[in-house]
Amino acid sequence: MARNSVLLLLLSLVASAPASAQLLVGRERSPPDLSGEWRLESDEDPGQPPLGDYLGIPYNDAGRQRSDTTAESIWGTSEYRCRPHSAPHQWRGLGGARILKELDPLTRDVNAYHVQFWRSLDRPIYLDGRPHPPAYAPHSWTGFSTGEWVGNTLVVTTTHLKDGFLKRGGPQTSDMYTMTEYLTRNDDYLTVVTIVDDPIYMDEPYVQSTTYEYDPNTIVQMESCVTSALGEAGGTDPHFVPHFLPGQNPYLTEWLGEQDWIPEAATRGGAQTQYPEYVLASPSGTRRAALPLSRSALDVGRMIAAQSPRDGEVHVLPVQGNIYMLVADGTNITASVGPDGVLLVNTGTAVMVDKVRAAVDALATEVAAAPRPNPCAGANCAGNAHGWASPAMNAIVASPAPARPIRYIINTSAAPEHTGGNAKLAVEGFFARRGGTNVTGAAANASVIAHENALATMSAPPGDAAPLPPEAWPTDTYFYDFQKLSEYVNGEAVIVYHAPAANTDGDSIVFFRHSEVISAGNLLSTVSYPFIDIDIDGGGSVQGVIDGLNHILDLAVAEYRSQGGTWIIPSHGRLADTADVASYRNMITMIRDRVRQMIDDGMTLEQVIAARPTLDFDGRYGSTQGEWTTDMFVEAVYESLARR
C-alpha cells in the first residue's frame, strides 16, 4: 500500500510532534517560513508519461474512458490554450516555484501565502480563517485554498477547481475534485504531498509527492500566450472539439512496442495498481476495491446538488458590474440592478415568487437607493451644496430613496421554472408606455420580452398543458436573430439573441455588454445534461444546443489565463466562465459524435442506450430518476440526429 503508506507516515510524523510544537504559541515558536524561490528537485512520477499510461492512478471506468477519448490537443483550443497547468500538475510542471508572504500590517502575522509557477496564476493560500465560497460560486484553475498549520506542516485544502488533468499525457479530472496538500520545510528542502480526491473518476484518492530545494537564484518566469490555435484545433473551424470515439484512439498503446517494461493491463490504471502486491501478482488476480474509498465519492450527489440548492430560499451572488445571480430553490435568475430600476432574466417558479420579490426589493434598496455619504468633512468640502459636511448631514442629504421597480423581464424560454413568477412580478413592475400611465387602457406593467415562439408556447402550449395567464405572457416579442433593447438599462446595452432549435424553438440568451455577463438560459446547466424538447411542437435538437453554446463562446472573452472575464449564468448550477462553457460544449459534442456513429452503424435506440455513450459523464451530469434522466437525454440526442 505504497501511496497510503506515504500518507500514513506523513500523518504519524505530524501526530508525533510535541504538543508545544503543535500549539506554536508565541512568535518565537512560529511555523517555518515557506516564502522564497524554490527549485524543483525531484518527484516520484514523470510529468508527462506516454499516452494511455494510467499506472498508479485509481481510475474507475468513467475516468478511464474520459481519458481514453480526450485528445491531448484539446488543451490547445482557443478556450483552453492560455490556461495554467491544472492544480495537481502545477507542483510538477516545468520550472520552480515562488512563494510570497502577505502580512497583516499590524500584527505581522502571515495572512496568506501566494504561490507562483512558470505557467500559473497567482495562487493565494489563505491562513486567516475565511470560509470557502458556496458551491454555486465559480471555479478556477487554481481553486480556492485555505491553510492551517499542524505542527511544522501546512495543510492546504483546495476546492472550486475546474476540470483538468493529473498529468499532461491525458489523465483527466472532473470539476468536482478537491485537493489536499501537505507542505513541510526541512532546512532548505520543501516536501509537497498532494492528495487528489475525485469522486467522479476515481475509486480512491491519488497521492503524489514532490521535493523542492531553496535556491534564491531560481527565476520563475511567466510564459507568454496567444489564444489563436486554429491550426491545432481543426483548421478553419473555431468550434472544433478534438476527441476520439470510444475504442478508436490509436495512440494509447503504440508506445508499448518500444517500452515493454510494463504489461498492457497495468497501463489501464485502477485502484489496485497503486499497491505493491499488484506488481507481485498476476494482473488478473489482483483485487478491486469493494467500495469507493474516496472521501467524497459517497457524497458526490450532494456535492453536485449544492451547486443548485433546493432549500426553498433565495441566495444572492454578486457577479460583475450591475449583475447578480439569484439562486431560487434550484433555478437561477439574473438581475440587473441600478439607477434605472431592475431587469430580470427569468422569474423562477410560481411557488418562489414572493421570496424572489423580497430578494429583488432588498437588492434594489441596497444597490440603487443606498446613501452615498460625502467622504469629506468640514467647511471647505468641494462639491457640497451646503459648503460643509458631517456624518449627520450625510445621513440627511443622502437618505435612501424608494427602490426603483422592475422595468423589464426577459424570458429565455417558456419553461415553467423560468416563467412562474411572470404574472405577479410583471404586474408589480412599471414600464411607461405611450407617454405615461394617463393614457386610457395603457398598461404600466413591466415589459416582458421573449422570442415569438416562446409566446406561442406560453399562450397555446402543445398537448393538454394549460396556457399561462395572459398577464404572464410577453408584451414584447422579437422574430429575428437578435433584439437590442431600445435604450441603455442601468448604464449598459442589453442584447437578446435567439438560439434556434436548441432546447426548444424559442430559446434566448441575454448579453449585458458593459458588465460582461451572459445569461444562458437552458443552454447551460452545471448539474444536468441539457434538456432537449424533440417533440414536433418543441423544435429542439442536440445540434442547436451545441450551436447555442458556440455562440456564447463567440461572445465571451476570458480575462486572463483562460478564466474569468465574461461570466455566464446557467439555468441551474454554479456561475461559469468561457472554459466551463467549453467543457460543457465538449461533453455534448463528444456524446453527439458517439451516438451519430452508432446510428451510422445501424444501432437501434435501445441498443444505443444499452451501450452507454454517456458513461464518462454520467457521474457528473446523469440521473436515473426525476424529470430529466440520462436515458431521456440519450433518446433526445438519438432522435434529433436520426431525423436529419
Where are each of the predicted segments found?
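Bacterial N-terminal signal peptides
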Residues: 5-16
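Metallo-beta-lactamase
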Residues: 341-343, 348-351, 369-391, 398, 404-418, 436-500, 504-506, 513-514, 548-556, ...
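Accessory terminal helices/loops
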Residues: 291-304, 434, 558-565, 574-644
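PEST-like low-complexity, intrinsically disordered acidic/proline/serine-rich tracts
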Residues: 22-294, 323, 395-400, 434-441, ...
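Conserved beta-strand hairpin/beta-sheet module of binuclear metal-dependent hydrolase folds
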Residues: 315-387, 508-522
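Metal-dependent catalytic neighborhoods of phosphoester/phosphodiester hydrolases
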Residues: 419-429, 581, 617-619
